[in-house]
Amino acid sequence: MRAYNFSLRGPAPIHHTLLQRRQKTGITLQTLHPKHFDQGMILAQTPYPGLNIPNSDMCTPGQLLDFLAPLGGQMLVETLRNRAFAPPLEDVGWYGKDMSEAELKHAPKIQKEDSHIDWDTWTADEILLRSRVLGDLWDNITWRKSISDKGIDHTSLPLKRTIFHGFEKWQNTDFSKLSKTDDSSFCLVTRENPPKILRVTSCTVEGGKKGAGSRKIIANLGKFAESDTGIHPRCIEV
């Protein structure tokens, strides 16, 4: 038994359903294929057109699983009662029968690299989405930038991974409204056009205590800040 989203196939359909911002989902009960993963005969499936994902703009994998799990249990019980598992088996799947393998999208296992922030291409909305779906995100840039933006050659600095435990979208682009005395959080300015501001609610710097990264990065910003940079002391342009 597994969650499906129409053309998704693979080990992580719930995560990819949310990452692709899909609005509908459902459940499939299938047999085990003798050779291939996730290609068994469909014994039961959520009817067309599927189920609306509750609160889809804010839904997490855990919440989606909690929504689907009791429905999946009910489907399994009904399948056992109807003995749909007994030969001759009937494929009752309604979606994808006329689709080629190329059209059926793969939902691969989530890897660590999926949480690696690509500042060149990820927008603020993409970062918030991945944070909600994947949990902690990370990069190797923020630590260096907290120092190198102040005129220091960043190539001479060691790489340090920063693990981000949470973000908030800063709705006001007026840097003057950011607190210069708050030592518990800082902001990152994205590269999209126009740039967006994300407040880091908590982070960990490689080699440091979990959740204590913000203070270390803010210490860098305070130590190396220059009055004529035009950058707010609590902001890093990544």
PLM regions: where:
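An anion-binding loop in the catalytic cleft
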Residues: 103-105, 112-238
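N-terminal, helix-rich and Lys/Arg-enriched segments in bacterial and organellar proteins
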Residues: 62, 66-69, 110, 131, ...
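Donor/substrate-binding cores of folate-linked one-carbon enzymes
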Residues: 1-106
